Amino acid sequence: PGRHRVRRFRPLQRCWVPCDDGYHRVFYRLEGELAEDDSVMTLRSFIDGEGEALVLEEIDELARHLVRLMPVLRLRDARFMRRIHNGTVPHSPQIEITARQLDFLSRELVSHPQNLSDGQIRQGLSAMVQLLEHYFAEQSSAQTRHRLMRRRSHDEQRSWRYLDIINRMIDKPGGRSHRVILLGLFATLLQAKGTVRLDRDARPLLLIEDPETRLHPIMLSVAWHLLNLLPLQRVTTTNSGELLSLTPVEQVCRLVRESTRVSAWRLGPGGMNAEESRRIAFHIRFNRASSLFARCWLLVEGETETWVINELARQCGHHFDAEGVKVIEFAQSGLKPLIKFARRMGIQWHVLVDGDEAGKKYAATVRGLLNNDRELERDHLTSLPALDMEHFMYRQGFDDVYHRVAQIPDNVPMNMRRVITKAIHRSSKPDLAIEVAMEAGRRGVDAVPTLLKKMFSRVLWLARGRAD
């Protein structure tokens, strides 16, 4: 609070909107309309907290000042940019000046006493330069790129390892001067490439497109940590579950393509309490980050259902991965946090529960979240008419599998529950589920229970509704 009064923001003083948290914010709206002659008309406005346009003169000049203060710097894979830009390479003397500036900045970092040798720190910085060259080489000719390649370290793995150490070193308290040096290094590379000329008051917004391209997951982690150290605002687009696992879910925004628009979904303020956030972080972010790309979650109680459901769906000709359906067990994290999270992130969901007491409680939780709406319940809940998946599949014609695993002769009478208990004792619930799934694979689609076929159709309908 109070930073809106500093010198560089004075031209925007009529645009500030006071907010409840004590901060002043600028809300800038940019609209585009396609005219009949296919030209685009751009409309600019500054708005208040209610979304109403402020009455201002010289809006274009204010917008230019805002862009000058907050320029967007776009990082993307240099391979794609080379197809667009050609013949705009800085002259060789400029490259030599850049090399001297980089050398000065690296010596500046070395001058601070650390546990690393000078050579190690220089090698770590060399890896950082490689990373930035990877994204900013779009204006390089083939000859220039070969010259840059010759300068790179021969031992790249060692360079990346040292860079990881430098990351952790700079991230310690009191590392502000080092961050400034890195930012200077970053700005030097930007200007040397001729990509942008930054105003001295600029605080750039870094737009990073698919940083996982051509980077091994370990190197991606190191590079992402480096970018986190730069005192800049960042917007990153990615298709990488590895990268999502490095990012708090509160900072993730899902983009969903719909028939007429692209919708953006995020948790927002007050989205989850501390306990729910911890469970989601462990269950989804750390262990199933790629599930954030799914269109629909099929929530099941445990590992048994995961094995059986995936195999039976495949027997019916449904490829869940291609359809954007992810089977997720919820017993460890709790059902309510997962549904709450899925709703806020724009992910469709369906729950499969057992018929025992625990399953009935889970079903009651789902009905409560749906306000006991029968129509919505049909879309989001399937209850097994049996104690659990083992009892259900036994009744659906797979009793011979359980007898075989339990090693019970056909002529020995024994009730269903004891057979299943013995089979689990001789194997395990997951292994027994795999046996049933393999037998279902041998029998074909006719062996799949009708209840599960209907559930598959409902889940795919939910997923496809979010697909187009």
Which residues does each predicted region cover?
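Activity-critical C-terminal alpha-helical subdomain
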Residues: K361-E435
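Glycine-rich phosphate-binding loops of NTPases
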Residues: G2-V110, R367-R374
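Terminal low-complexity/disordered tails
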Residues: L432-D468
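Switch/communication elements of ASCE P-loop NTPase nucleotide-binding domains
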Residues: R161-N287, A364, W461
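The start of beta-strands in P-loop NTPase/AAA+ ATPase cores
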Residues: P71, P204-L205, C296, W349
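Extended helical coiled-coil dimerization/tether regions that scaffold
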Residues: P90-L205
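Conserved catalytic network of the ASCE P-loop NTPase/AAA+ motor domain
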Residues: H65-R68, A192-D201, L226-L230, S290-L292, ...
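RecA-like P-loop NTPase motor core
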Residues: L244-S245, E250-A358
